[in-house]
């Protein structure tokens, strides 16, 4: 017999309302034992919740959803009572005294919904993304994914790939036909259409991934260059202590903001120099740990101390230690003191921005540059939200399509084209969960809240 699961659906702790969710074949039995009544599906009942001996534990609203018309596709019971944690724990213990009921694993309700075809894998992930959204744009985009906008685009691509694959395999199976199906141009035209449509979905998915993941920007530089002042200017508040004493910042400071909806994780680090102080050495090592893991490095220079053209020589060792292809922007700070004109220029292959973190002159230029460098495009409408695994799958599918195009146009190798199309179909289907591994499912649902 299939197991019945139960969990608290509201956050742990004190609140106005607390909800317990039960899903599985014993949901009706739970209702009968706790409420003493058979519930009418989809109708709110205001009833007392009783203990084993009939003592009232709480009173609230009970809702019953009959399979398959529920979130999980199973019988579901929701008990909505007062949000005191002691009350909820007592009610949970009471439910667990019924044989055949256990505590749900993290994400198990959503997993059951996926397994019962109530939603696909991309939609299930969107539930977690909607809960974790840190901006209005991210929330709206996650909701679009939950409603199936991303999945629909993927399913349309898969359908076209299946159609083309069928056509190619038919051409292979009937080689004696008078028409050369591989050379008549129809397959290539259809293949090109799929390639172009996939490129459009990849671009939209990239925007969705930026909206979800954001950018990790690390501010690096010598002591007293103005790193903490820049952190405060970008954050719009006094997040870091600022003094004229070099080495004030000895640890890593994190600040999370949004640039037109794009999450930006700004990290202020200890000044980079030869240090004899053991505490400062630890701070510098932590700074390097953040620098090598960054999406973007902001190298902060004091414009009153050195020429703009001297940075490659002065910072040659620093630049050599950066990971290959690490995006780096040179910040010439304190232009209010040096007299330099604020703005963005290109210098020796680097983007250089002149600004004053203290007066905030030129800080808006930096904000726009950070958005542009990530390829983020602000939009009031927004698209769907995407994860890194989605981007990887789309990239892999694009490579197989490109390889398939080569097999068709250069070698007229129908069998190899058909194989590439099969791989495209499987790769795209991993996004929605039509073709996926149990390990992937476990990794995805284990990141959910326990009551979801």
Curated annotation (Swiss-Prot):
Mg(2+) binds at residues 228, 249. CDD domains: trmE, TrmE_N. GO terms for molecular function: GTP binding; GTPase activity; metal ion binding. Keywords: Cytoplasm, GTP-binding, Hydrolase, Magnesium, Metal-binding, Nucleotide-binding, Potassium, tRNA processing. Coiled coil: none annotated. Binds 1 potassium ion per subunit. Transmembrane segments: none annotated. (6S)-5-formyl-5,6,7,8-tetrahydrofolate binds at residues 21, 78, 118, 452. GO terms for biological process: tRNA methylation; tRNA wobble uridine modification. K(+) binds at residues 224, 243, 245, 248. It is found in: Cytoplasm. GTP binds at residues 224-229, 243-249, 268-271. InterPro entries: G_TrmE, GTP-bd, GTP-bd_TrmE_N, GTPase_MnmE, MnmE_dom2, MnmE_helical, P-loop_NTPase, Small_GTP-bd. Exhibits a very high intrinsic GTPase hydrolysis rate. Involved in the addition of a carboxymethylaminomethyl (cmnm) group at the wobble position (U34) of certain tRNAs, forming tRNA-cmnm(5)s(2)U34. NCBIfam families: mnmE_trmE_thdF (TIGR00450), PRK05291.1-3 (NF003661), small_GTP (TIGR00231). Homodimer. Heterotetramer of two MnmE and two MnmG subunits. This is tRNA modification GTPase MnmE. The lineage of its organism: Bacteria, Pseudomonadati, Pseudomonadota, Gammaproteobacteria, Pasteurellales. The gene is mnmE.
């Amino acid at each position: 017999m299939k197991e019945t699961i139960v969990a608290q659906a509201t956050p742990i702790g004190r609140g106005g309302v607390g909800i317990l969710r039960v899903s599985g074949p014993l949901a009706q039995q739970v209702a009968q034992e706790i409420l003493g009544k058979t519930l009418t599906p989809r109708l709110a009942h205001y009833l007392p919740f009783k203990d084993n001996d009939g003592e009232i534990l709480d009173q609230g609203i009970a809702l019953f959803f009959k399979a398959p018309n529920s979130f999980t596709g199973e019988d579901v019971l929701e008990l909505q009572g007062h949000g005191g944690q002691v009350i909820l724990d007592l009610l949970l213990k009471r439910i667990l005294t019924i044989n055949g009921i256990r505590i749900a694993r993290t994400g198990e309700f959503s997993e059951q919904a996926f397994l019962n075809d109530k939603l696909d894998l991309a939609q299930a992930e969107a539930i977690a993304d909607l809960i974790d959204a840190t901006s209005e744009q991210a929330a709206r985009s996650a909701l679009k994914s939950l409603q199936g906008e991303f999945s629909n685009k993927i399913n349309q691509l898969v359908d076209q790939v299946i159609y083309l694959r069928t056509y190619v395999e038919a051409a292979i199976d009937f080689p004696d036909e008078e028409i050369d199906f591989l050379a008549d141009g129809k397959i290539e035209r259809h293949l090109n259409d799929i390639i172009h449509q996939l490129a459009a979905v990849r671009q939209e998915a990239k925007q969705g991934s930026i909206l979800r993941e954001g950018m990790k920007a690390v501010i690096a530089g010598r002591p007293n260059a103005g790193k903490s002042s820049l952190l405060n200017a970008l954050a719009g508040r006094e997040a870091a202590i600022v003094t004229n004493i070099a080495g004030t910042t000895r640890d890593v400071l994190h600040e999370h903001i949004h640039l037109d909806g794009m999450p930006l994780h700004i990290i202020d680090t200890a000044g980079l120099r030869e240090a004899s102080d053991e505490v400062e050495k630890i701070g510098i090592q932590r700074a390097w740990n953040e620098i090598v893991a960054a999406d973007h490095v902001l190298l902060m220079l004091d414009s009153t101390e050195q020429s703009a053209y001297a940075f490659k020589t002065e910072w040659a060792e620093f630049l050599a230690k950066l990971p290959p292809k690490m995006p780096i922007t040179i910040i010439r700070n304190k232009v209010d003191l040096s007299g330099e004109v604020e703005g963005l220029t290109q210098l020796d292959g680097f983007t250089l921005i002149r600004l004053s973190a203290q007066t905030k002159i030129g800080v808006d230029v930096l904000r726009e540059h950070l958005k542009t460098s990530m390829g983020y495009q602000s939009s009031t409408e927004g698209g769907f939200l995407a994860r890194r695994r989605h981007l990887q799958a789309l990239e892999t599918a694009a490579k197989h399509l490109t390889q398939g195009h080569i097999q068709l146009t250069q070698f007229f190798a129908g069998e190899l084209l058909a194989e590439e199309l099969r791989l495209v179909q499987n790769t795209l289907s991993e996004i929605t969960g039509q073709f996926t591994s149990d390990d992937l499912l476990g990794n995805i649902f284990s990141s959910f809240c326990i009551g979801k």
